[in-house]
């Protein structure tokens, strides 16, 4: 089924938004390849893009710099387009250790990974939607530039079923097996099928809640229907249905056997090269490992690390780029690069890191040279494959400005009337004492403070010193994982502490209305953390509060500081003019803390993908439980925690993790 994008929202574009939407849409239809949407924090960039998508009515790919921001965007677009296909495409690895070889210590590290089945299902749903409908918006990370199966193979393998079609049951089962579906009569799970008389039930790999029931009679499809695999209740009847492969890497038996032959040819050629260089150990190692893989592929059609032979399986020439998610996009699609100042450099860096590791594996006989072609796209290859694009950022980089050739659409006015923070410059010599006095002023007002330093050591020392002065303070550093990071931000908003110190506080998720002061220590030390874009991004962290201020501690005004101050002042003036013209009185953004922490109340109802589960708080009196009861309670909570993590509900996962820790402590006590 395909339809039109229908934006659902309780408000309409205001401020700079109507003009921005009109310009972006007009330029898109005029064939302009690259545009920049320069939007300040809180100006409604996501809502603006949603309006553009509704007006141009083209399949859209939104790229974000990390999984956390991608999850936030996915949730927002899902709310804007509830009747359309909004999909999520990120790396499906919860944990990934690529295979590697360290020549200095003669250490080979085997590939080790843990795949998140829920995200794998969402990836499959994304590619199916791109191939089968036009009203599709996919939110992705740089995972989109990594190799996938070829779309033509993916399409040619699909099983198209129609009511009244003649198909023998054996033929149907054989086709499902070619799609890598497994037969399971006991438990119908994703990617499996079962046979009961003349009824074949299939749980599509990309489906979250519904399975397919195929009822045959005398070699003819008598009925097609979707049903709930848990209750067996029919959801709706169908006239037609397409079953897509269980994995993006599925291929035909003929293609696999053909690949085996070409791999043998490459092996023979490379072994001769190794023997010629007198690399006997490497040659023996390569022959043994590759021969084992070839036997597995010939017998079962698959082997561990089969992605290293993807060039042979797709029939590509040496050095040719692999098929990626961009090959699934139609030519007239729209590409949106969110936080482009971060995402663009990421895309350029992916290829080089992957290449250096694999070159070592090839050199020492762990892989054939064709493994080098299992790679992400080079930056220039990505540019060629990119459709018409919009770069979205508060601080676009030089690449975006150059590529857009002056097509920069500004989104500087916030509908809330909030003005960019006031900026003050104060001397470095007294920065710590002055900071303490400023923190105390904010605490009296019930506000929070963000402090950014240049090094980890400075952050640790400052945190320790301020803590000794009686200030409730926490330190955010790179070793903290996503869930714990969200928990720290939540605790700051809840007032469990007042000051958050970090090195690079530019990352998403730090837009908190409670923060009225951002302090930047050593602001005059030029470098990555004190560049113009970094300063603007950091200053913007206080842009959600009506009392927002930024203090730059510096003894001189650098070029980056001057540019950041001038740009912020320009934005302040434009917002003031808009407020005066429209009679708007700025008010701080009111964002309920329950939005961040559903678990602040007992017995919270959790919206988990329509499953309607209820997650209850654990009893406070843990000491009343015996060891067996504590162990049982911990097991139940762990299952709930992992489910929340799979559903991208990191705040709830963090809350339950805390409960498990308290239970563990009670058990030890």
Swiss-Prot record:
SUPFAM superfamilies: C-terminal UvrC-binding domain of UvrB, P-loop containing nucleoside triphosphate hydrolases. Keywords: ATP-binding, Cytoplasm, DNA damage, DNA excision, DNA repair, Excision nuclease, Nucleotide-binding, SOS response. Residues 26-414 form the Helicase ATP-binding domain. One of its GO terms (molecular function) is DNA binding. ATP binds at residues 39-46. The keyword DNA damage applies. InterPro entries: Helicase/UvrB_N (IPR006935), Helicase_ATP-bd (IPR014001), Helicase_C-like (IPR001650), P-loop_NTPase (IPR027417), UVR_dom (IPR001943), UVR_dom_sf (IPR036876), UvrB (IPR004807), UvrB_inter (IPR041471). Its main location: cytoplasm. Residues 631-666 form the UVR domain. GO terms for biological process: nucleotide-excision repair; SOS response. It comes from the Bacteria. It is found in: Cytoplasm. A motif (Beta-hairpin) lies at residues 92-115. Residues 435-597 form the Helicase C-terminal domain. One of its GO terms (cellular component) is excinuclease repair complex. Pfam families: Helicase_C (PF00271), ResIII (PF04851), UVR (PF02151), UvrB (PF12344), UvrB_inter (PF17757). Forms a heterotetramer with UvrA during the search for lesions. Interacts with UvrC in an incision complex. Belongs to the UvrB family. HAMAP family: UvrB. The beta-hairpin motif is involved in DNA binding. The UvrABC repair system catalyzes the recognition and processing of DNA lesions. A damage recognition complex composed of 2 UvrA and 2 UvrB subunits scans DNA for abnormalities. Upon binding of the UvrA(2)B(2) complex to a putative damaged site, the DNA wraps around one UvrB monomer. DNA wrap is dependent on ATP binding by UvrB and probably causes local melting of the DNA helix, facilitating insertion of UvrB beta-hairpin between the DNA strands. Then UvrB probes one DNA strand for the presence of a lesion. This is UvrABC system protein B. It comes from Xylella fastidiosa (strain 9a5c).
């Amino acid at each position: 089924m395909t339809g039109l994008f229908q934006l659902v929202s309780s408000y309409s574009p205001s401020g700079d938004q109507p003009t921005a939407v009109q310009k972006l849409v007009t330029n898109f239809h005029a064939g302009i390849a690259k545009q920049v949407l320069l939007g300040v924090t809180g100006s409604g960039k996501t809502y603006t893009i949603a309006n553009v998508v509704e007006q141009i009515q083209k399949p859209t790919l939104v790229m974000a710099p990390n999984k956390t921001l991608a999850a936030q965007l996915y949730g927002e677009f899902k709310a804007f387009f509830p009747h359309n296909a909004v999909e999520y495409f990120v790396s499906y690895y919860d944990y990934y250790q690529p295979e590697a070889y360290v020549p200095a210590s003669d250490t080979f590290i085997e590939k080790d990974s843990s795949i998140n089945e829920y995200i794998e299902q969402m990836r499959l749903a994304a590619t199916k939607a791109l191939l089968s409908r036009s009203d599709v918006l996919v939110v992705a990370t740089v995972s989109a530039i990594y190799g996938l199966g070829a779309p033509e193979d993916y399409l040619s393998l699909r099983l198209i079923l129609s009511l009244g079609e003649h198909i023998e049951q054996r033929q149907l089962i054989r086709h499902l097996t070619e799609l890598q579906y497994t037969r399971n009569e006991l438990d119908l799970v994703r990617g499996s099928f079962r046979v009961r008389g003349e009824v074949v039930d299939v749980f599509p790999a990309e489906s979250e809640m519904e399975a397919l029931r195929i009822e045959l009679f005398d070699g003819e499809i008598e009925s097609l229907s979707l049903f709930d695999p848990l209750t067996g209740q029919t959801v709706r009847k169908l006239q037609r249905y397409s079953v897509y492969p269980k994995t993006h890497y599925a291929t035909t038996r003929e293609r696999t056997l053909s690949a085996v032959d070409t791999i043998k040819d490459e092996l023979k050629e490379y072994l001769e090269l190794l023997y010629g260089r007198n690399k006997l150990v490497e040659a023996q190692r390569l022959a043994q490992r590759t021969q084992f893989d070839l036997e597995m592929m010939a017998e079962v059609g698959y082997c561990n690390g089969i992605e290293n032979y993807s060039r042979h399986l797709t029939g590509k020439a040496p050095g040719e780029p692999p098929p990626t998610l961009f090959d699934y996009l139609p030519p007239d699609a729209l590409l949106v690069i969110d936080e482009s100042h971060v995402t663009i450099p990421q895309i350029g860096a992916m290829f080089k890191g992957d290449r250096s590791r694999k070159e070592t594996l090839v050199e020492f006989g762990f892989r054939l040279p064709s493994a080098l072609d299992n790679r992400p796209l080079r930056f220039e290859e990505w540019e060629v494959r990119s459709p018409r694009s919009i770069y979205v950022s508060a601080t676009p980089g030089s690449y975006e400005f150059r590529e857009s050739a002056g097509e920069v659409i500004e989104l500087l006015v916030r509908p809330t009337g909030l003005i960019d923070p006031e900026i003050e410059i104060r001397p470095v010599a007294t920065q710590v004492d002055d900071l303490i006095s400023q923190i105390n002023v904010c605490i009296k007002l019930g506000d929070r403070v963000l402090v950014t330093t240049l090094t980890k050591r400075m952050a640790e020392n400052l945190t320790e010193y301020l803590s000794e002065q009686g200030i409730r303070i926490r330190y955010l550093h790179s070793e903290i994982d996503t869930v714990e990071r969200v928990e720290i931000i939540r605790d700051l908003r809840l007032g469990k502490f007042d000051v958050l110190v970090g090195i690079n506080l530019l990352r998403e998720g730090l837009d908190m209305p409670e923060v009225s002061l951002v302090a930047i220590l050593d602001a005059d030390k030029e470098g990555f953390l004190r560049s113009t874009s970094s300063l603007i991004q950091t200053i913007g962290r206080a842009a959600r509060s009506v009392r927002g201020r930024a203090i730059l501690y510096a003894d001189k005004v650098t070029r980056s500081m001057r540019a950041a101050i001038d740009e912020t002042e320009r934005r302040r003036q434009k917002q003031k003019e808009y407020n005066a013209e429209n009679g708007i009185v700025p008010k701080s953004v009111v964002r309920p803390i329950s939005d961040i922490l559903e678990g602040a109340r007992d017995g919270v109802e959790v919206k988990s993908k329509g499953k309607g589960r209820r997650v209850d708080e654990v009893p406070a009196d843990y000491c009343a439980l015996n060891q067996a009861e504590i162990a049982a309670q911990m097991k139940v909570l762990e299952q709930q925690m992992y489910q929340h993590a799979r559903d991208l509900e990191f705040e709830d996962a963090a809350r339950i993790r805390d409960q498990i820790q308290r239970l563990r402590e009670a058990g030890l006590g």
